[in-house]
Every structure is written in structure tokens, then in C-alpha cells.
């Protein structure tokens, strides 16, 4: 749930949002914005599940989450990208997608995951990426 839901869906939402903002075609921008909205809802569901797991399963879930945080922190990914020519058509190249994923992990996933470990579940604000 954490890798696919929290990380994957958050990254997919950000990728769709950035792709849509870069697209020249208005219809494509609307489609990609809709996809981004859907992916954000999926990510939010995953984060809610993680909050439940940490609260209900206690140490087992917290230890597993700590392991995932450590894995994410040890991964290296590009942190900058040039959107290039394809971006105006709503397409990002592999380097751009990897850089966006790294941005989401750094700015959204890791802070939210750490918050789950230290805050009472009732105090953790959950927002889509």
C-alpha cells in the first residue's frame, strides 16, 4: 500500500498535473487535470489507510513504515529536468518523470510518512499531493 499507493499515486498525480500544465492543447490540459484529480484521490485513500495501519497495527506498521522511509531516502534520482519538446503535447520523458517522482518523495511522501510516525492519527492532516 505504501509504495504503490502513497508513493506511486502521489507521483502519478504530480506527473499528470505538470504534464497538463505544460500541454498546449486545452482539451488535453483538461483531460490531464482530471487524471491528476483521480490520482490525488487514490493517493489520499492510500494515506488514510497508512494512518489507520499505524494507529491500529502499532509497532509492526511503524517499523515497516520506517523501513520504507529509509529505502526512499537511500534512492538516488534526478532532481531537475528539462521538459523538452514533448511536454507541449502532455508527454514527459523518463528523466522528467524520475525527477518529478523524486520531488514528490522529498516534498510530500517523506514529510507525510514521518508525520504518521510522530503524530497522533487524529492530528495528522491528510491532503492530496
Task: Locate predicted features.
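Non-heme di-metal
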Residues: 1-129
Amino acid at each position: 500500500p505504501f509504495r504503490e499507493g502513497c508513493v506511486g499515486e502521489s507521483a502519478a498525480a504530480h506527473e499528470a498535473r505538470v504534464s497538463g500544465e505544460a500541454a498546449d492543447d486545452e482539451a488535453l490540459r483538461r483531460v490531464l487535470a482530471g487524471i491528476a484529480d483521480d490520482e490525488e484521490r487514490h493517493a489520499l485513500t492510500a494515506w488514510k489507510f497508512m494512518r489507520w495501519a499505524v494507529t491500529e497495527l502499532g509497532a509492526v506498521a511503524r517499523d515497516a513504515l520506517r523501513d520504507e522511509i529509509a529505502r526512499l531516502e537511500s534512492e538516488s534520482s534526478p532532481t531537475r529536468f528539462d521538459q523538452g519538446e514533448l511536454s507541449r503535447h502532455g508527454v514527459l520523458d523518463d528523466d522528467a518523470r524520475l525527477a518529478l517522482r523524486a520531488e514528490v518523495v522529498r516534498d510530500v511522501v517523506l514529510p507525510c510518512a514521518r508525520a504518521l510516525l510522530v503524530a497522533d492519527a487524529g492530528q495528522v492532516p491528510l491532503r492530496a499531493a
